[in-house]
From Swiss-Prot:
Protein name, UniProt field: Endonuclease 8
This protein's UniProt keywords: DNA damage, DNA repair, DNA-binding, Glycosidase, Hydrolase, Lyase, Metal-binding, Multifunctional enzyme, Zinc, Zinc-finger
Family: Belongs to the FPG family.
Cofactor: Zn(2+)
Protein's organism: Klebsiella pneumoniae (strain 342)
Amino acid sequence: MPEGPEIRRAADKLEAAIKGEPLTDAWFAFPQLQPYQSLLIGQRVTHIATRGKALLTHFSGGLTLYSHNQLYGVWRVVDAGEQPASNRVLRVRLQTARKAILLYSASDIEMLTAEQVAHHPFLLRVGPDVLDMTLTVEEVKARLLSAKFRHRQFSGLLLDQAFLAGLGNYLRVEILWQVGLSGKRKAAELSDSQLDALAHALLAIPRLSYHTRGQADDNKHHGALFRFKVFHRDGERCERCGGVIEKTTLSSRPFYWCPGCQH
């Protein structure tokens, strides 16, 4: 599954295609969204935000299109007027004079006012997004130490979107390797310096993955263009301590780690 950095890069591509340009056409497959088609003509997409796997497409008139790709949804960028052949079912088309963005196969799509965005059940459940560049290390450390999260094992916590949105399995194992921690540790057990290192890595590693897009590397996953230290490297030597990287299952997902230097 693509994780936060890959979803943010997808949002960047959509923004590059249509952001700031007047919409010449808007089309929705779902009847409850069709009344908005004429209303959006002439409006502009001001920005596209991400919260975990949800995209929030903000329009100049104040409305926001909420979409969650779940397992099957996918966005495409095409030239204006282009109707690409696809076995997928088209759900959304937003077009300017130059480009169009198309959403296929997704079923979780809503048009929201600002107040509805603020009270949306999914958005209330998820934590701050690791690719939100206003999120600070201090805020992440405070979440780690909160009563809700301080006694949770990292193996599960780092997959819980209520803790931080945008993390997933490859980020989970790379973050824990970076700070030398086992997936069975908890924030309540850590020293202050360990907490600082973990809070920093929880932001730095997803952002490194995001910012290093475009660098060729065969050792990648869903476009995560930075070199993995442990993910999918079981049986290889750890570059830090020379131990052998192992694979197990934690929180129902494959977990890669080095027993020699992760404690």
